[in-house]
């Protein structure tokens, strides 16, 4: 209830705040209006100032023109003075000039003596002034020119116009200025003197200018002019009723057009300024004051303030009207908003109060516990009686866990077992209540349901235990059958190499096929049983996916060749050299897919494509077999499921292989998919994550950069892969169309070359070739299509074979030097298992090799110390001394004979460990006769060459 009361108070406060907002908006409009009026006033002041400046320019021109006249008259007077007699020379006169008489300026002035002395000078000056008046004075509007002697201060008046002379006024003005001039400091006495006296009517006066005349650096006389000044000439035509006043240097009014009542006195604020613009004290007038050089006078223009405001009066009235209208509009809007928003909101608050009371009653009467918990600390804000009872059953730890779950917002329900063994299921949703984040919780007693689920779980566990027991039984039986089967299969393989009576060979072949199928079935059942009983674990470690793929193709290549199929293995350059995973299980999956592809393909080829796909390693197995119908693809990975009818039923199997593959890949965090069409073949794609991937360095094979290889490959996929691989190694690749090669060029083809190749070598990719590349004739190499990624290494050996021909370890075996009689080779077989040891010895005997056996590494060292051994075939994992320690001990004794490891763990790291211990090679069980023959041929030839050297 307090919440709703607070809400109503908030609404009331919001109403007052809205009114305050309206007032602030009105004040903002008022301030904007004032700013606009002030801006208009400044603009009007700028216009008036511009008009004042233009008018003052006319006054300045008047003063400047008078100053120029004084300079001309002074020049005339000084240049006509005779330096010899101190008089103006009258030469050049043609007419007689009127000579003015001297008049005393002071009572003690003696003008009679001066009249006689200056008679000639005055006559000459009068003639020149008369000449100047007739030709130039009209342009300057002068009234008279006068000359005053410097000693006795008598004045000679040269009238230029016929106008009455107010002698007393003029003499008084001259008397005052002459005294001022004579008493001035020496620095100021050499400058011109300007003043103005009032005329017969307002706005008209007389402007006087006085300048000294020197002769031989001695003041001889004072020359002056009088000119009528009219203030009306200092106005521009306009609408402003402006006044104009000229002040002296002390700020006293000399002449004004506005009348004595409006005369402006000098203001200390602007008397020292050359130019000043502003309002007078009391803001009665707007004035502009400017000096009039070269005189010491100043001119002041003024205009009443009411005339300034007259132009913006309408702007002021409009602004006032705008503020009144804006205030009325804002007041109306505020009232309307209150009536339509705030008043209805207060009514809604009252209704909410009623609704909350109603909801409280519903919650209190609910058959389940309902409560509201604060998200921050889990405190119970509101709850019914049942929820209160349930919450009291919870322990402190349960309350803390419930609070953490609510804060985490990861799940929406939790099951809790209370202290009295009551099972509560608490579900909740997040919401807002009283301005807080809360969780609305519903508590339900699910004890009955939990007991039922426990009963069902016990039944399921019993069934699971029975299933696991069955799986364990199958796994145990299958494992016990596998060991003797290895001996059966190996001996049957050896028996097939013997000369058998007619009909017996068919029986042996059937026995061999049945044994292999039985071994495959037992292995699948064992793996599936381990998966079902959760005993099969993924053992991740670092391995090389390249080595795993090479090993798989090497195992299945003989079977592919026997079926007259082609096996292409494309390992892209972006495949990591190492990653973390379970190589044994990956090998099992790919081997199963490859085995199925061989089994269901009668013609065509099989492609194994390995590449990096983002963060995954993608392995694709594609065949040209019978294909799978779309409706059966969805059940392809079900246990014991076999595809279709007809031809598919001719292939035996348990139907567990793909189910095991899917489960293994899923355990490795990968996925497997299939794309198939009947009659077109199938494509299986396996993806595993690239955990801890290490990528190869992007650089070419040393020594191959710039070499040229010609491609004449019909298979488009093989051609594209070879081109990319060779270019990555720095080799120049060109399509061969019959061009003439250079002696260093190599031809790469997948068909028989009709004519002799004139280059360095020919490499032919053959689907029937098994094993490492062989040189069948000088410069003619045969290469398996199952390992095209090894072509750059072969090319490196082809180009370097002449440089390293003296090293027998780098020599390649060739078929023309193969030895069919191997009785000169003594091979030591080391294996702790008697059947495997005997089987391997028999296989070597069938190939013509001499053989000795040893039980373990210690026994092998004893045999080596007493007999000459050429090659050692040793099991890796043996008691007493394993194959690794045997090899290391052999190398420590200084023996360099080839040591070949034989292991059941045919993984990349196992082979790498064998090589690091000092072994020359490593074979994987089961070891077939073909693999033994091919491997021993290489090392036997190496031993024979070392004997010859």
Curated annotation (Swiss-Prot):
Q: Which residues form the PAS domain?
A: 357-425
**What stretches pass through the bilayer?**
20-41, 314-335
Segments forming domain Response regulatory: 826-940
What's a Gene Ontology MF term here? ATP binding
InterPro entries documented for this protein: CheY-like_superfamily, HATPase_C_sf, His_kinase_dom, HisK_dim/P_dom, HisK_dim/P_sf, RcsC, RcsC_C_sf, Sig_transdc_His_kin-like_C
| Modifications made to the protein after synthesis | Autophosphorylated. Activation probably requires a transfer of a phosphate group from a His in the transmitter domain to an Asp in the receiver domain.
Q: Which residues carry this modification: Phosphohistidine?
A: 479
EC number(s) of the enzyme?
A: 2.7.13.3
| Main localisation | membrane
Keyword list (alphabetical) reads:
ATP-binding, Cell inner membrane, Cell membrane, Kinase, Membrane, Nucleotide-binding, Phosphoprotein, Transferase, Transmembrane, Transmembrane helix, Two-component regulatory system
The chain's Periplasmic topological domains, given as residue ranges, are 42-313
Query: What spans does the record annotate as topological domain Cytoplasmic, numbered to this chain?
Result: 1-19, 336-949
List-wise, which residues carry 4-aspartylphosphate? 875
Please name the HAMAP family in this protein's record. Answer: RcsC
Give the similarity note: Belongs to the RcsC family.
Q: Outline the subunit composition.
A: Interacts with RcsD.
Q: Give the protein name, as stated in the record.
A: Sensor histidine kinase RcsC
Gene name per UniProt = rcsC
């Amino acid at each position: 209830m307090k919440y709703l009361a607070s809400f109503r108070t908030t609404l009331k406060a919001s109403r007052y705040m809205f009114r305050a907002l309206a007032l602030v908006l009105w004040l903002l409009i008022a301030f904007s209006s004032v700013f606009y009026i002030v801006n208009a006033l400044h603009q009007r002041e700028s216009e008036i100032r511009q008009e004042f400046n233009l008018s003052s320019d006319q006054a300045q021109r008047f003063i400047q023109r008078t100053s120029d006249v004084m300079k001309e008259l002074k020049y005339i007077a000084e240049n006509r003075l005779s330096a010899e007699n101190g008089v103006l020379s009258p030469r050049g006169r043609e007419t007689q000039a009127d000579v003015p008489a001297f008049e005393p300026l002071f009572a003690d002035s003696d003008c009679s003596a001066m009249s006689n002395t200056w008679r000639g000078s005055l006559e000459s000056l009068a003639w020149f002034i008369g000449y100047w008046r007739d030709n130039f004075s009209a342009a300057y509007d002068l009234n008279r020119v006068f000359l005053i002697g410097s000693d006795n201060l008598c004045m000679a008046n040269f009238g230029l116009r016929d106008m009455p002379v107010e002698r007393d006024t003029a003499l008084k003005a001259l008397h005052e200025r002459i005294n001022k001039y004579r008493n001035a400091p020496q620095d100021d006495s050499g400058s011109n003197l300007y003043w103005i006296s009032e005329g017969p009517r307002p706005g008209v006066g007389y402007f006087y200018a006085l300048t000294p005349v020197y002769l031989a650096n001695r003041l001889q006389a004072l020359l002056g002019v009088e000119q009528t000044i009219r203030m009306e000439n200092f106005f521009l035509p306009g609408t402003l009723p402006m006044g104009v006043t000229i002040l002296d240097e002390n700020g006293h009014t000399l002449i004004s057009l506005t009348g004595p009542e409006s005369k402006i006195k000098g203001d200390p604020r602007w008397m020292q300024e050359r130019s000043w613009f502003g309002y007078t004290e009391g803001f009665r007038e707007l004035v502009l004051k400017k000096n009039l050089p070269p005189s010491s006078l100043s001119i002041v223009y003024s205009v009443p303030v009411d005339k300034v405001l007259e132009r913006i009066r309408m702007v002021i009235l409009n602004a006032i009207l705008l503020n009144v209208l804006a205030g009325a509009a804002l007041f109306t809007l505020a009232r309307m908003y209150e009536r339509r928003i705030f008043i209805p909101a207060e009514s809604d608050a009252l209704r909410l109060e009623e609704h909350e009371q109603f909801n409280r009653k519903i919650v209190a009467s609910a058959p389940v516990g309902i409560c509201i918990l604060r998200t921050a600390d889990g405190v119970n804000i509101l709850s019914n009686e049942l929820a209160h009872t349930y919450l009291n059953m919870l322990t402190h730890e349960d309350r803390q866990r419930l609070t953490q779950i609510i804060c985490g917002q990861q799940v929406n329900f939790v099951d809790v077992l209370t202290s009295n063994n009551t099972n509560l299921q608490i579900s909740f949703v997040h919401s807002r209540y009283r301005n807080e984040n809360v969780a609305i919780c519903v508590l339900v007693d699910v004890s009955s349901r939990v007991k039922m689920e426990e009963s069902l779980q016990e039944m399921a566990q019993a069934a699971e235990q029975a299933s696991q027991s069955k799986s364990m039984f199958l796994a145990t039986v299958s494992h016990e059958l596998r060991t003797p089967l290895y001996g059966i299969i190996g001996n049957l393989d050896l028996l097939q190499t013997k000369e058998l009576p007619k009909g017996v060979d068919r029986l042996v072949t059937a026995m061999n096929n049945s044994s292999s199928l039985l071994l495959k079935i037992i292995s699948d059942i064992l793996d599936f049983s381990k998966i079902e009983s959760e005993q099969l674990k993924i053992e991740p470690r670092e391995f090389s996916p390249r080595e795993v793929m090479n090993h798989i193709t090497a195992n299945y290549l003989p079977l592919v060749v026997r079926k007259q199929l082609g096996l292409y293995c494309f390992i892209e350059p972006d495949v990591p050299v190492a990653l973390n995973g379970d190589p044994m299980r990956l090998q099992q999956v790919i081997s199963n897919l490859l085995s199925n592809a061989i089994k269901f393909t009668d013609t065509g080829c099989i492609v194994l494509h390995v590449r990096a796909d983002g963060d995954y390693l993608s392995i694709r197995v594609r065949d040209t077999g019978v294909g799978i119908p779309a409706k059966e693809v969805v059940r392809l990975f079900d246990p014991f499921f076999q595809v279709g009818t007809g031809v598919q039923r001719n292939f035996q199997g348990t139907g567990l292989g793909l189910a095991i593959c899917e489960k293994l890949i899923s355990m490795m965090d990968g996925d497997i998919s299939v794309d198939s069409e009947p009659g077109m073949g199938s494509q299986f794609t396996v993806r595993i994550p690239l955990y801890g991937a290490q990528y190869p360095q992007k650089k070419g094979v040393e020594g191959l950069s710039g070499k040229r290889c010609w491609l004449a490959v019909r298979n488009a996929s093989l051609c594209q892969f070879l081109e990319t691989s060779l270019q990555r190694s720095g080799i120049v690749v060109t399509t061969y169309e019959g061009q003439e090669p250079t002696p260093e060029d190599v031809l790469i083809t997948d068909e028989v070359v009709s004519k002799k190749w004139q280059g360095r070598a020919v490499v032919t990719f053959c689907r029937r070739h098994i094993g490492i590349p062989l040189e069948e004739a000088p410069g003619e190499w045969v290469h398996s299509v199952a390992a095209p990624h090894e072509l750059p290494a072969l090319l490196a050996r082809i180009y370097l074979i002449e440089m390293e021909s003296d090293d027998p370890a780098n020599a390649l075996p060739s078929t023309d030097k193969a030895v069919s009689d191997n009785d000169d080779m003594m091979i030591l077989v080391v294996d702790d298992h008697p059947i495997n040891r005997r089987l391997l010895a028999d296989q070597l005997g069938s190939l013509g090799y001499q053989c000795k056996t040893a039980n373990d590494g210690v026994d092998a060292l004893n045999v080596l110390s007493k007999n000459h051994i050429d090659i050692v075939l040793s099991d890796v994992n043996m008691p007493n001394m394993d194959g690794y320690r045997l090899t290391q001990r052999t190398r420590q004794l200084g023996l360099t004979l080839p040591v070949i490891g034989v292991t059941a763990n045919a993984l990349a790291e196992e082979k790498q460990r064998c090589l690091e211990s000092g072994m020359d090679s490593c074979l994987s069980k089961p070891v077939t006769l073909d693999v033994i023959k091919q491997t021993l041929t290489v090392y036997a030839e190496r031993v024979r060459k070392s004997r010859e050297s």
